[in-house]
Amino acid sequence: MKFFKNNYKNILSTLLVLTIFIISGAIFLMFLGFGLFGLSRILIFFKLGYFTYNKNLVDNLVYYGSYIVFGYFILFAIEHLMDYFRKQLPNNPYFNGSLYQLISYVVTTILFYFIIHIHYVYIEIDFWVISVIIGLLYIFKIIFYPDSENLNNKK
């Protein structure tokens, strides 16, 4: 009987943590969606981008959502690959300072454009607009996370 008493406490605490995780994730995705909706409206207003894919709600979510997810994957993969190179070659001048950030930015922008963006024919954004958007993302990353370190590594 004692086993079931402790088991219920574990189940309740797990459900509480899971509920908080799901709610915070949903709020994050909602804010991300509103932010990207606002970005798309700004691009349309200034005639910098055109979004012509207009089916039902689920198809739009899958089409535009996959564009965002694949783009995030490219940014994430390049960032980790460049960090790996920087750790393997610490004395290389190409992987230190602002030149490292410039190489990361250029590689990410070119790979995003030629791997992801070209295949989405209903999203019409010029290369220079994508370059400015990704450049702003890198600038914000440098401002808000200047020298972030992995807190999980215990030395």
Curated annotation (Swiss-Prot):
Record's keyword terms, sorted: Cell membrane, Membrane, Transmembrane, Transmembrane helix, Transport
Keyword Repressor: no
A Pfam match: SepA
Subcellular location, record wording: Cell membrane
A cellular component annotation (GO) from this entry: plasma membrane
Record's bilayer topology term: Multi-pass membrane protein
InterPro entries: SepA
TM helices/strands, residue ranges: 17-37, 61-81, 103-123, 125-145
Keyword set includes S-adenosyl-L-methionine: no
Family: Belongs to the multidrug resistance efflux pump SepA family.
Function statement: Involved in multidrug efflux.
Name listed for the protein in its UniProt record: Multidrug resistance efflux pump SepA
Organism: Staphylococcus haemolyticus (strain JCSC1435)
Underlying gene: sepA
